[in-house]
Amino acid sequence: LVLDGVFNHMGRNAPIFRSAEAEPASVYRNWFVFGPQFAGGARAWWRAENLPELNLENPEVREHLFNGHDSVVRSYLRDGVDGWRLDVAFDIGFVYLEELTRAAHAEKPGSLVVGEIANYPKEWFPSVDAVMHFALRHLILRLVNGEMDTVTFARMLERMVTECGIENMLRSWIYLDNHDTPRLATTVPDERARRLAQVLQFTLPGSPNLYYGGELDMPGGDDPEMRAPMRWDLVSDDNAALAWTKKLIAMRQHHRALRVGDFRPISSHRLLAFERHTDQVAETVLVVANPGDEAVTETLMVANSKLMDSTEMVNLLAQHPGAPIRLWASLLQVTVPARTALVLQPQVAPPGGYTNYKRVQ
């Protein structure tokens, strides 16, 4: 259970702010920044007068929010929550985020602090344990909507994984929509492109983060549509989006490499291809995605020395077995239909009892 913490600002009608605003001698006066230069009389988040910002430079504020024994962050962790998702974490800044994260870990080792950070994530670690992956969301949506080619996507992704580190990537949340964005069914109107985006959400290094209704293809544009109530009328056994989401969840649960595996890019001209792997070759997963409008046949080099020649690869997303896909001397020829992905795993224990993986794990 991860709670949403808004520690940068509060509502104008909050008793603490009302006291500070009304009484210059209030004990809460220095919890905010007042002055005639601000519309509404106090510094407010993005100049929204109803959202006065907290003065985090005041140690008393930080003591109340996260440093003190009875602070908001620490008391809720003691009560059993597992972590915090920090609203507008980029506004809190590196220094105070790191202070908050240290306080959380001191109170509850292993607790998670996830920052809503729209910036390039590299330097925000270890100020937070993880980020909401704005950059990866934009990359995925641009790819499946035909606004970015696979080579550019692969280059940017590889740089981000290398610079941020795989552990930080694995902890971070991969989301495709939330309460601040139009919903996926609206931003990606093509159904096959939408399904492809979801495959990437569940196979790229990170933790998939689902927004209620997304599993049902619930539509929604700008505010207030993006925050509309749940569409319970869409829940049915016939909902293809729900069935697809359940399939992706089960696939990720059953294949360890998709949860904790390392990442290795696979070079391609027209496809997006990458490998997720652990210390066990049997857990290796290859992902080959085609965001284009036409089927693509290409030969890829899979630079994994543990994968044996002539290994058959099983497509984890296939409804019915198709033509066998085999790895020959590290080369893999694939045909990927338009706006589709293959998620392949090596068959290391084929029927018949013999395996050339007997001394390779």
Q: What are the roles of these predicted feature ranges?
A:
Residues 2-3, 84-85, 112-115, 173-175, ...:
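Structural recognition of the beta-strand scaffold that forms the well-ordered cores
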Residues 80-82, 175, 335:
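Short loop/turn motifs at secondary-structure junctions
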Residues 17-21, 71, 82-168, 172, ...:
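Active-site-proximal helices and loops of the catalytic beta/alpha 8
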Residues 194, 205, 210, 216-361:
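Carbohydrate-interacting/catalytic domains
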Residues 4, 76, 86, 113, ...:
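Conserved, mostly hydrophobic/aromatic
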Residues 182-188:
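Short, solvent-exposed helix-loop connector elements
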Residues 1-79, 100, 104-107, 123:
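Substrate-binding/active-site clefts of carbohydrate-active enzymes
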Residues 78-81, 129, 206-207:
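A structural motif
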